[in-house]
């Protein structure tokens, strides 16, 4: 096709679709006996884009994975936490099934399945949420509950969470309404006591109150992209009842609250069961027995707990689990560093005793899987600094002494004869 203003006879040309003359448009594209202007081309593009948007949800509906498939995918990236994976798989499946079929089924209204994850630092709470969003191909954003305050106070408003989600999907409201929001450190907004306070608690109970409607489902008014620069623009209306909220926290001390309830409820006097010290449950076993009343005693308000009906507890990772995390998942830490070293033409080998030493160090720090990267990074720092300037390094070997800081990694060089032969 060619861009024409006039035909060979000098006759005025018109768009075959909208009828505008060549003087009323910027471009007029000629085909066999027909013409189309740039405005009609733009209009056609808009129509096609709208049709693609309408077709996309139907594709998503047919692609909803089953709980078994969700669990299997989580197994590829997250080690252990079997019960938490099962709980998450069912809750996420039910949530998106609810969206697919509408809020009602046979006249029965389907409630939201927002999730509360309870587990120590580095046990995989954030990774589980991220992996779910990646599997389902939905927008995902994280928020830190400690930065949130009630509207009108210094800090971040809860509505900013929805704005972040919109940013992740280029302000496409329909996409955002199918997204996942992970709110971390939710235990840090517990009120100071389990009795209602007459004083203002803008970063504790106040934030819980502010989050209530957002998590349960409301229409949040969010300024559009560049909203502050263009205050005359209308706000975007986002229905949060379709967004899956996952809240997570370490809840340090919750095990003691549960233990007190369990021991108090076991009875006193001659008929009571006397437990030896050795029979005391571990922290993970206690957290698995969590009840709403325990969370209320911890400092969450009853209304907030009611908006998080699905509770999954995660155990503290064992030394064996940390070793598995280092080498087994698809994006395992050792695989990541091996890929980095391969870009420099060198092979990176972690000996088994090195992995044991890394896991022991992380256990001592009580940072869970989160502390593994900093330990490996410290051990490899000097090598990663020097390697790009070095020649002929074929292999780097990491053993226990390197992790302990007692020696440097073993560097294995290529044979000089091979270099000379290649040079000839």
UniProtKB/Swiss-Prot annotation:
InterPro entries, per database record: AAA+_ATPase, ATP-dep_Clp_protease_ClpX, ATPase_AAA_core, Clp_ATPase_C, Clp_protease_ATP-bd_su_ClpX, ClpX_bact, P-loop_NTPase, Znf_CppX_C4
Alphabetical list of Gene3D superfamilies matching this protein: 1.10.8.60, ClpX chaperone, C4-type zinc finger domain (6.20.220.10), P-loop containing nucleotide triphosphate hydrolases (3.40.50.300)
ClpX-type ZB domain span: 2-56
GO biological process, one term: proteolysis involved in protein catabolic process
An example molecular function term from Gene Ontology annotations: ATP-dependent protein folding chaperone
Cellular component terms (Gene Ontology): HslUV protease complex
Domain of life: Bacteria
PROSITE patterns tied to this protein: CLPX_ZB (PS51902)
CDD domains hit by this protein: RecA-like_ClpX
Record's keyword terms, sorted: ATP-binding, Chaperone, Metal-binding, Nucleotide-binding, Zinc
Pfam families registered for this protein in UniProt: AAA_2, ClpB_D2-small, zf-C4_ClpX
Positions that bind Zn(2+): 15, 18, 37, 40
Binding site for ATP: 120-127
PANTHER family according to UniProt: ATP-DEPENDENT CLP PROTEASE ATP-BINDING SUBUNIT CLPX-LIKE, MITOCHONDRIAL, ATP-DEPENDENT CLP PROTEASE ATP-BINDING SUBUNIT CLPX-LIKE, MITOCHONDRIAL-RELATED
Main function: ATP-dependent specificity component of the Clp protease. It directs the protease to specific substrates. Can perform chaperone functions in the absence of ClpP.
Assembly with partners or alone: Component of the ClpX-ClpP complex. Forms a hexameric ring that, in the presence of ATP, binds to fourteen ClpP subunits assembled into a disk-like structure with a central cavity, resembling the structure of eukaryotic proteasomes.
Protein family per UniProt: Belongs to the ClpX chaperone family.
Protein name: ATP-dependent Clp protease ATP-binding subunit ClpX
Organism whose genome encodes this protein: Klebsiella pneumoniae subsp. pneumoniae (strain ATCC 700721 / MGH 78578)
Gene name for this UniProt entry: clpX
